[in-house]
Swiss-Prot record:
It comes from Streptococcus pneumoniae (strain Hungary19A-6). This is Phosphoglucosamine mutase. The modification Phosphoserine is found at S101. The lineage of its organism: Bacteria, Bacillati, Bacillota, Bacilli, Lactobacillales. Its EC number is 5.4.2.10. GO terms for biological process: carbohydrate metabolic process; peptidoglycan biosynthetic process; UDP-N-acetylglucosamine biosynthetic process. Binds 1 Mg(2+) ion per subunit. GO terms for cellular component: cytosol. Keywords: Isomerase, Magnesium, Metal-binding, Phosphoprotein. SUPFAM superfamilies: Phosphoglucomutase, C-terminal domain, Phosphoglucomutase, first 3 domains. It comes from the Bacteria. Catalyzes the conversion of glucosamine-6-phosphate to glucosamine-1-phosphate.
Length: 450
């Protein structure tokens, strides 16, 4: 991670950390870096979610892009993966999404996509950061005829919706409940599933600029769980603020998380011979029950660090077409370059329709082990060295020996905060509590600062 760019673009509290001034510079410098080798007038797509700060930051960002001669196609409110899809399919130089994903409304973010539809690599981000930190802005300042042109492009959203519908199957009146998190999916999810023939109940579809992710969406699926049971829906589908995640709810009101969604889609593709190298890419946070289910089905797995960017890197490097995270990021590389909650939802309902199985039946093939995660505040310098502390190494090894292969322990530093994360999985909650509490007691005694 750089000075400005985190694991998913530039984020911060809108108007305090992520200011219009910074957004202007990101537009100007980011646009230049991503289009400097273009032979024709560069074109950049810009989208945003429903946050009240979105239009403010969009105006500043667009001004920066126009100032270096870039033509800007303004997409309005739509999902992050829609920007990636449109960049790749319509030959744009780049795309920019203004969103802080599942964060509360006071935050916002700016993330870039290259002309291939993928998020930027570290080298491109470093180029932009170098320009941000330069003492003087020496980029070209074209005169009137060289300035960029601003184009409103609402057709982009319709094209994305049509594309997702084309990947699905008719749902013939299937009862579907949607929670669009008062976010980006509020402009598209209803239309997509109506076009597929679903009978819909929708919540989280009245954004006011301040209620994005507020007690709704993939991080707060409780309301959707109740709606599914009350409406008799076959499935509930909860997206986050920018609709790059999906958490599902089965007909009984039970949560189906990213691990189970990946398993269901992966098994379906594997049985059709369409799972590349018969492998799913996942992260170290995926549940042990997910791993055991894959082993039972003979499906391989590749494991990365936490973060969808690392999943995508591994998929691109090795040619895999399915990967994701427990949190609901699912990347279907045959269809899009990034996690796409609405695409995952369309595929999940297609599998239900084609197999004739309920979501609870499909999800029951994965037995999720109880999991507990505790964050311990430590000095930043110590979080990377924790595993070198003898007492910590010894207690982890002791707990792993006691598990005898029927559980899992993960101790890792936070990528963004002065925290050490201690996670354990085991067959019962009592065992999980024992393993985590025993390890955290030692960690706190040795290096904790609480």
């Amino acid at each position: 991670m750089g000075k400005y760019f985190g694991t998913d673009g530039v984020r911060g509290e809108a108007n305090l950390e992520l200011t219009p001034e910074l957004a202007f510079k990101l537009g100007r410098f980011g646009g230049y870096v991503l289009s400097q080798h273009e032979t024709e007038a560069p074109k950049v797509f810009v989208g945003r979610d429903t946050r009240i700060s979105g239009e403010m930051l969009e105006s500043a960002l667009v001004a920066g892009l126009l100032s270096v001669g870039i033509h800007v196609y303004k997409l309005g409110v739509l999902a992050t993966p829609a920007v990636a899809y449109l960049v790749e399919t319509e030959g744009a130089s780049a795309g920019v999404m203004i969103s802080a994903s599942h964060n509360p409304a006071l935050d916002n973010g700016i993330k870039f996509f290259g002309g291939d539809g993928f998020k930027l690599d570290d080298e491109k981000e470093a180029e932009i950061e170098a320009l941000l930190d330069a003492e003087e802005d020496t980029l070209p300042r074209p005169s009137a005829e060289g300035l960029g042109i601003l184009v409103d492009y609402p057709e982009g959203l319709r094209k994305y919706e049509g594309y997702l519908v084309s990947t699905g199957t008719p749902l013939d009146g299937m009862k579907v409940a949607l929670d669009t998190a008062n976010g980006a999916a509020s402009t598209s999810a209803r239309q997509i599933f109506a076009d597929l023939g679903a009978q819909l109940t929708v919540i989280g579809e009245t954004p006011d600029g301040l209620n994005i992710n507020l007690n709704v969406g993939s991080t707060h699926p409780e309301a959707l769980q109740e709606v599914v049971k009350e409406s008799g829906s076959a499935i509930g589908l909860a997206f986050d603020g920018d609709s790059d995640r999906l958490i599902a709810v089965d007909e009984n009101g039970d949560i189906v998380d990213g691990d189970k969604i990946m398993y269901i889609i992966g098994k379906y593709l594997s049985e059709k011979g369409q799972l590349a190298q018969n492998t799913i890419v996942t992260t170290v946070m995926s549940n042990l029950g997910f791993h055991k289910a894959l082993n039972r089905e003979g499906i391989n797995k590749a494991v990365t660090a936490v973060g969808d960017r690392y999943v995508v890197e591994e998929m691109r490097k090795s040619g895999y077409n399915l990967g994701g995270e427990q949190s609901g990021h699912v990347i279907l590389m045959d269809y899009n370059t990034t996690g796409d909650g609405q695409l995952s939802a369309v595929q999940l309902t297609k599998i239900m329709k084609e197999t004739g199985k309920s979501l609870s039946e499909l999800a029951a093939e994965v037995t999720i082990y109880p999991q507990k995660l505790v964050n311990i505040r430590v000095e930043n310098v110590m979080k990377e060295k924790a595993m070198e502390v003898p007492a910590i190494k010894v207690i982890i090894e002791k707990m792993e020996e006691e598990m005898a292969g029927n559980g899992r322990i993960l101790v890792r530093p936070s990528g963004t905060e002065p925290l050490l994360r201690v996670m354990a999985e085991a067959p019962t909650t009592e065992e999980v509590d024992y393993y985590v509490d025993t390890i955290t007691d030692v960690v706190r005694a040795e290096i904790g600062i609480d």
